[in-house]
Amino acid sequence: MSDYKSTLNLPETEFPMRGNLANREPEMLKSWTENGLYQQIRESRKDAKPFILHDGPPYANGDIHIGHSVNKILKDIIIKSKTMSGFDAPYIPGWDCHGLPIELKVEQKVGKPGHKVTAAEFRQKCREYAAKQVDGQRDDFIRLGVFADWQNPYLTMDYSTEANIVRSLSKVIDNGHLHKGVKPVHWCTDCGSALAEAEVEYEDKMSPAIDVAFTVVDKPALLAKFGVNEYPHNISMVIWTTTPWTLPANRALAVGANVEYTLVEMVKEGQAQALVLATDLYESCVERFGAESHTVLGTVAGSDLELLRFNHPFYDFDVPVILGDHVTVDSGTGVVHTAPGHGQDDFVVGQKYGLEVANPVGDNGVYKPDTEIFAGLHVFKANKNVVELLEEKGALLNHVQIKHSYPHCWRHKTPIIFRATPQWFISMDQKGLRQQALGEIEQTQWIPDWGQSRIEKMVENRPDWCISRQRTWGVPITLFVHRETEELHPDSVSLMERVAARIEQEGIQAWWDLDASELLGDEADQYRKVTDTLDVWYDSGSTFSSVVAARPEFNGHPIDLYLEGSDQHRGWFMSSLMISTAMNGKAPYKQVLTHGFTVDGQGRKMSKSVGNVIAPQHVTNKLGADILRLWVAATDYSGEMTVSDQILNRSADAYRRIRNTARFLLANINGFNPETDMVAVEDMVALDRWVVRRAAALQQELLEAYDQYNFHLVTQKLMQFCSVELGSFYLDIIKDRQYTAKEDSNARRSCQSALYLISEAMVRWIAPILSFTADEIWKLLPGERGEYVFTETWYQGLQSVALESDLSDEYWDQLLAVRAEVNKVIENARREKQVGGSLEAEVTLYADEALQAVLENLGDELRFVLLTSKTEVVALAQAPSDAIETELASLKLSLKKSEAEKCERCWHHREDVGAVAEHPTLCTRCVTNIEGEGETRQFA
């Protein structure tokens, strides 16, 4: 017989080397959808223990970006791994559909509500626009291989959800957490209405910049703080502002608790006075004030000045010093004029100190009739009058005109103001919500754990939550308020349920169409309907109740996990916590996981202007979704997540390693029937038993990593296994046995059994991450199986068996190390053309006593482990002087090219080639494998 190729067991598989994912994945998606895969998974987990991950709804506007992809893929990996762990883990995706960005898009097309279109028509247009955006985003999410009930998502604009949001608010009200107050908002005096952040543009504007002195009320108390016994002249604290018109509303002076302040005497035109200024700024200040000389009298920390009082510069009252985190020493005086009715920072810090939110300005930007001195003046015209009055009172230390960036109305292009307007709030303290929420944070697991202190600080310091907006497209605050007393209707809670029932049938328009008399009868004239809408953060923050508690898939089970970007401590995690605690006295979640933002290779934020945006659509079309999924899984999401074309190409390389491993496994179990060909683990060749043991140990590690959401560890350990234990060791060693042993021999079937077990386990390991590839592998695995890997659980067939006669795992670790050293020497010899390949080499190993015993254990099978034609083990003491040193102190090597004939079939160089006359080109091992019983292997 001259052609022995037909006697070899050569690998064969339909699993292609190239993934061609960009083209193949869409076909698989189509098949998954047509076969109702998501429903099959649900069916397979009927009555199983539930695991509920609640989807934080992305906003239904624009294309998805890479951050959306990270978020959805992380959720998908969790859902799939929990399903593999036997849980019933439904995934209902959601979208946030109300609010300003959608209004603005619709406004560009149809104009403002009440102009060319009615408010009702405008809402309908918003609804249609949001629905279209949802469709676009849904297609992009599906393309990522995310499994969800895509045909039945939740939308915050679903009639049922809108109704449940109203019901949620009624519970918050019933529990006593709502109150009415005022809050400063961006206000356009030309529009006569509030503006949202998105409607504000910043343009340069000339404004008066003034330094104003507030004289101290209790001079001895102030002097004592600075350690000064007495001072005969005036003492003042100085503020700097570019909005003189807000001074009538001043109610405090804010200093920084950790900022140092100096009491400095300034002499100007022969007159002395002492001023309190930030230490870092006093020199530039006194120079600006035109001082002829100055003397430092003392310094203190801002915290020491708290609650000292100073006289208002032109009204007959005094104001306190308060501490504010917003105070800086970048410019000005280091003291901030505080008017809670005219600034967000002022308002927040004012709430802490219970300051009056004075609002002397009407809708049209004119001071109200009861405003002392300035009644009837427009605020911007009043700047001049305020400056003149300050000069007259001797309180003006400096006045210049400056050019600076200032908020303008995007419609009128005119400067806007901050002014306090009546709003609805959820109170943090009137019913102990703050303390309750802090207690609930303690009961929640935060991943990473720094999330806990972050949200705790926010809850400790946050003001009451303003939940009202003056918008058209939003869930209405369905309240009736008494026209004279401004009190809520006493039956508000039951009235809200009746309104909710209508909204459930007709959507939010039902509220605006409702005539008060339909619900209030004769009382209708005494009450007015509230026209405000809810903050969209209330919409999304109440979905634990409006969606999860309402949908049958969740069966009333508590939510296990919220997972969003780290900005959501302030956003969705916070709003959900507040509403749930206000409604039910407990947090809505057991665990909260946050991931970092995506940045480019240089750590910069993604930005179209910088040109560093990586669009997920581009990645899936070019590389495939599995590459994007592998990048997400392999990246430690606890910090910023770096992505670039180069990084994605590295993910593609890692993917190829996994794919090549899978291909090798499939090609070598081709024709293997697990029913008839399986070798029991205890009957396997020792090396095969070892690799099954390694796979079993690895599975434990992977399952633990999945359970703890450490997906980067899953990919690291998997890559290590594919590259080191399998690629560089096991798969390399078994090729000879797999290809040359008798087809049905124990030597070969043992090896195939191990490969089969690893394949069954590995396809499940990768399924949550490389979903498309896992499905492809699953369909090519031998043996009876269900249609999809995704309905399976983790593989139970990996038995960690070690026989008494077995070589220990430490032993195999030593062999791995020895083989690595031998490989280096052979590679070197190949480079220097001493040998053509490892089978041309004959190697002598000089080992110390312990290692010698280990190596000699294997007998003649050591050569199969080292992939050489011949190996000899000799005592280290006998090593010649030219023996090659290795990184193992216990081992030296020598290598020579074999002079023996090469076997045509197995390519080993053996002395016995041609010993059997009928097969002159074969070694006796190959003859046994072709014609005899076949070789037996014990170790490798």
Curated annotation (Swiss-Prot):
Primary localization class, coarse: cytoplasm
What is its EC class? ligase
Quote the Pfam families the UniProt record gives.
Anticodon_1, tRNA-synt_1, zf-FPG_IleRS
Q: Where does L-isoleucyl-5'-AMP bind?
A: 564
Catalysed reactions listed for this entry: tRNA(Ile) + L-isoleucine + ATP = L-isoleucyl-tRNA(Ile) + AMP + diphosphate
Q: Partners and quaternary state?
A: Monomer.
Q: What is this protein called?
A: Isoleucine--tRNA ligase
The organism that produces this protein has a lineage beginning with: Bacteria, Pseudomonadati, Pseudomonadota, Gammaproteobacteria, Alteromonadales
The coding gene here is: ileS
